[in-house]
Amino acid sequence: MPKKKEDSQKTLSEKEAKGLIAKLSDEIRHHQYLYYVKNDPKISDFDFDQLFRRLQDLEEEFPQFKDLASPTLVVGSDLDKDFEKFQHKLPVLSLINTYNDNELLEWVNKTDPEGLYSVEWKIDGASIVLYYENGILKNGVTRGSGGIGDDVTDNIRTIRNIPLRLPEPITVYLRGEVFMTFKDFEEFNALSSGKYANPRNLSAGSIKQKNSSDTAKRPLRIFTYDATFPNMEKKFKTHQEIFSKLEKLTFPVPPNTAFVSGSKIAKTIQEFKKQKDSLGFPTDGLVIKLNDISKRDALGYTSHSPRWARAYKFDAIMKESKIVDITYAVGRTGKITPRAEIEPISLAGTTVTFATLHNQDYIDELGVGIGAIVRVAKRGEIIPAVEEVVTPGKEVFKIPDRCPSCNTQTIKKESLVDLFCPNPDCPDRVKNGIIFYCQRKQMDIEGLGDKQIEFLYDHDYIKSIADLYDLKDQKEKLMEEEGFGEKSVNIILKGIEQSKQKDFRFLLPSLGLSELGHKVTELLIEHGIDSIDEILSIAKDQKKIESLLEIPGIGPSTIQAFQENFSDKRILKLIERLKKAGLKMKADPIQVADQQPFAGQSWCVTGSFENFQPRDKAMDLIVYYGGRKVSAVSSKTTHLLAGPGAGSKLEKANELGVSVYDEKQFLDLLKSLKIDFKNLI
């Protein structure tokens, strides 16, 4: 009989864990410095991800040893003190990596199996963002932290195939990758006594040269692969249209980009793989993107990456092993995830004893069973994955149709391949929900790691998130438990008490409600939906619920989840208990400096203007003086600045009674406020 989930870290003593956390922290900081600052990485992305995830897991398991300066609290950046800093106009996100066809196709089937996708070369170079205004290259900026980058414009201007002036006076922001061809790299490296390791490192270092004349001597090139046109009234419907526009604007794009249906992606990947070794430029994989822009908008983003794209990485490291057992775990959402326990193997310097099997469809497709000899690949996860079956076991493993934790009949949700336990009282679901709530990125309750929460649940101290706030009533009893001395109990209770001061913008996503993560929470707050009372009011009104679709980044799936979440009596009871416990149920106001005339106002800007070209300059001015930017007119919008071509936004504003200003009225307003806008734009 398969066993329940076991914690692979339980064999570590606290002393061993403390030492390992310190060692991993130092090692990761060293590699972050080499990668982001020196552009001289010494280990692969695989190995770095493994170290990072290992440290994250240990810190969650032993939170008492987490360091306030832990590298897991800091996002890596290539910012350099020698360059001016530039605030990106849009978040510069990364992509989620996949390492095999099965994983990618699982995402395709979940996203849009019949849709059209682009398949592009993933260039192995240095990421750059180009900003053009009225057809002129204004800024070239490194990705940096994703929000702020280094302005390396002078160096970027020296790259031969970057157009400095476009054939149209258009404003456009582009993502691109700076690289060198193998031929150019070999020739340049020969002249430099062979001191450069590879084209990628040389490209990254070249755009960070302090003297642009040195950059000009290096044979750099660029491919652009995505763009935003902020002022175009006619929006693009597909990524293919954007690609065509880039080519018309004389931007170089990755060659041989294919646009294929979801059913043809696997075949297309094989065709690309046949070409990769004969390419003249460095690539480390492919990028697969959903073609339909409206579908992208509906899917939206996480805080780190778009949901509508994936990176497909080449050449995962693989080794053979034997499956000893197959276990399965129940997550907080009820999802049941099987994993193979394998004979220990060494992959990229780490000992691997478990490998994920994803779901029953994946198991069936590969024909995985206990006793099988399989190939295991190192991936971007802490637990690698079974990729191939070399020698089958006696029979293909079947996940039991009942939850391993509570014995409830499992179900399949619409359009998903995973099995789920539907029982909200399932012990493993509840425990993992509490663990999620307490994690560092959520409510960050010190002293409560996985082990402590499992103990408290199993010994009837807590049975829900709300029970944490009654734990103080059992302090004396808890201190008598093994491993819970007075000091550790005081740390736990202090952490619980301090969590009451966490902003509502942390509380709401920490509840683990479907589709209500940090990104959606921020979108709601930005649009004035900043309290639980406001949310519950909307949940009772169908028209108000539908109006949420006006918020960019919120799609139909989020709306459906919103309705389901806030009509669930269990969730409503939890919210009520947390209210009574004293947690914050309204977002803290953003502090605005004195003399901010637009403070408390929400402005939308549309149309064209004589004094504000591009029109973003008007919005930047409003934000500078305390206003809030909104991209669509809704009942929460207080003002609309409308120029010629305003269209439907002006009609909507008039319907809702929003204050409308034309350009002359806006200039008069600025004059009355004694704002000299010409010195600011």
UniProtKB/Swiss-Prot annotation:
Gene this chain is encoded by: ligA
Binding site for NAD(+): 45-49, 94-95, 120, 143, 177, 289, 313
BP-aspect Gene Ontology terms: DNA repair; DNA replication
EC class of the enzyme, as a word: ligase
Requisite cofactors: Mg(2+); Mn(2+)
Stated role: DNA ligase that catalyzes the formation of phosphodiester linkages between 5'-phosphoryl and 3'-hydroxyl groups in double-stranded DNA using NAD as a coenzyme and as the energy source for the reaction. It is essential for DNA replication and repair of damaged DNA.
CC annotations in GO: cytosol
Any one GO molecular-function label of the UniProt entry: DNA ligase (NAD+) activity
The protein's Enzyme Commission number: 6.5.1.2
Lineage: Bacteria, Pseudomonadati, Spirochaetota, Spirochaetia, Leptospirales
List of catalytic residues: 122
Name assigned to this protein: DNA ligase
Keywords linked to the UniProt accession: DNA damage, DNA repair, DNA replication, Ligase, Magnesium, Manganese, Metal-binding, NAD, Zinc
InterPro entries linked: BRCT_dom, BRCT_dom_sf, DNA_ligase, DNAligase_adenylation, DNAligase_N, NA-bd_OB-fold, NAD_DNA_ligase_OB, RuvA_2-like
